[in-house]
Amino acid sequence: YSYMQGFWEGMGLRTTMNTRVTLSDLRRMNKYDLCILSAHGAYYTYSYGTFRKHTRTEPIILLTEASTLYKDIIYGFDLLAHRIIKLNGLYCVTADFFRNAYRSGQLSNTIIYSETCEFLGVTNSVDESMAEALLAGGARTVLGYVNNVYTVYSRSMLWDTVNHLAMGQTIGRALAHAKDTYGENDIIWYTEQGGRRPHAAAAYLVLYGDESARLNVPENFSLEERAEAAEDMLADVLESAA
C-alpha cells in the first residue's frame, strides 16, 4: 500500500493511508472523493438478546480497534442496535452503522471501493445491505466482493482500477479494464497463474450506483500525458523488479 500511495501521489492524487482505522474514522469518509476499505470482512452469524436469543447473518467489516469499557459506553447505542458488534475483543461494523452515520446523505459524490471479503455476502446468499446503506448515505458508487477473495487478485484489481481512475477514466471503464486484465473473478486469475487448488467459490467484484463517476484529477496535464506518465512509472517498476 505504501508503494501504491507513492505511485498515486506521483499521478497527482493526494492520498491518505490509515492502517489503524477506527469507528470514528469510518464516520468521516465523506472527506474523501475515493475511500478504499482494505480490511478483513465476513458474512457473519452472531447471537444477540439477553433473555431471548436471536441470530442474525450479515456482512461485517472487522476493525483493529480494541473494545474497552470506556468505548463501550460511548458506543453504547450502536452496540445495542447492532450497528457495531464485537468479535474477539475487536469492533466490527454492520451495514446499519453506515446507514446511521450517513443518514443525512453526507457521502455525496464519494466512491467507496471495498476489498473486504464477503462484503456482498456469498454465493446463493448475496447480501447487498452494505452497498445499499452506503448509497443511501449519498455515495455515488460502491464496489465490493461476493465471497472470499484472494488477496493478490484483490490488490491487482484495486491497483489497475485506481490507476485508470487517475488517468481520468470513469469508474465503469476503469473496472472493465481491470477485469479484462486480471479476469472477471479470482479463480480465473488463480488458474492463469498456474494454481491447481482454487478455493470453493469464485470471488467477483460488483459495482453499484453511477458507472460514470470520476475522480477530480488535477488538470495540469492531459489524459494522454497522464497515461504516458503511468506507463513510464510502470516500466520503472518492471525494470527494478527484473
Whereabouts are the PLM-identified features?
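Solvent-exposed, well-ordered amphipathic alpha-helical segments
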Residues: 5-9, 108, 242
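Long, low-complexity, intrinsically disordered segments
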Residues: 233-242
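Catalytic cores of nucleophile-dependent amide-cleaving enzymes
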Residues: 60-156
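A domain-level signal for caspase-like cysteine endopeptidase catalytic cores
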Residues: 1-82
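Active-site-proximal C-terminal subdomain of hydrolase catalytic domains
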Residues: 111-229, 234
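Polar low-complexity intrinsically disordered regions enriched in Ser/Thr and small residues
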Residues: 44, 52, 79, 92, ...
